[in-house]
């Protein structure tokens, strides 16, 4: 188990190739990627911070709805062949035997998926004012941050020019998840009833934004 007082921190502005601290920051990215294997991106722009605030507001509006609310039920993924939409509490797979995931989620993918490949299902959006627009805007912003991060990793490990970016540019398998971990009664909290158990993701990288520690 990795124990850190705080994660390595990378200045997002210094990942721009014309920044004064670019070479030094690339070495910091390499070191963090090797050990512990993750890092925290700092110094996001005011525009990105504003988009995050709007996203948080939309998430609060959606996840505050009851599980029997028509807005949620209309896009419920339970017993559906479409994984895009609202996943109710305890539907998340148990990634470790004997655990129960204490969360609900809203999942969606890129529009081009269902247009270019019929095997992909279309997105389903909750009927909440500006929800779709605000959430898509934050995903576009995070996509730009992701590509910048891929460029940094590419440079750090001396891959062929834009190798990582070129292998991630279609985003066919890219998915954004809005996750809600409701506060649990202290009597229910134990090693088996977890927010989400330890697991690995299948993407090249995963960007995580949290509203609280944990």
Task: List PLM regions with ranges.
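Peripheral, non-catalytic segments flanking oxidoreductase cores
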Residues: 1-214
């Amino acid at each position: 188990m990795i124990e850190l007082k705080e994660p390595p921190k990378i200045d997002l502005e210094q990942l721009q190739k014309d920044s004064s601290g670019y070479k030094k920051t690339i070495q910091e990215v390499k070191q963090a990627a090797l050990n512990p294997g993750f890092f925290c991106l700092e110094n996001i722009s005011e525009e990105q911070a504003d988009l995050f605030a709007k996203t948080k507001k939309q998430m609060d509006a959606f996840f505050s709805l009851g599980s029997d609310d028509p807005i949620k039920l209309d896009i419920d993924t339970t017993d559906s062949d479409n994984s895009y939409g609202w996943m109710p509490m305890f539907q998340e797979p148990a990634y470790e035997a004997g655990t129960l995931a204490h969360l609900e989620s809203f999942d969606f993918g890129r529009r081009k998926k269902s247009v270019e490949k019929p095997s992909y299902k279309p997105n389903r959006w909750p009927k909440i004012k500006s929800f779709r627009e605000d959430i898509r805007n934050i995903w576009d912003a995070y996509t730009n941050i992701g590509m910048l991060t891929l460029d940094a990793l590419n440079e750090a490990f001396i891959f062929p020019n834009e190798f990582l970016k070129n292998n991630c540019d279609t985003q066919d398998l890219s998915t954004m998840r809005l996750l809600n971990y409701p506060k649990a009664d202290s009597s229910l909290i134990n090693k088996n009833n977890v927010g989400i158990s330890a697991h690995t993701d299948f993407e090249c990288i995963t960007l995580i934004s949290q509203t609280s520690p944990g």
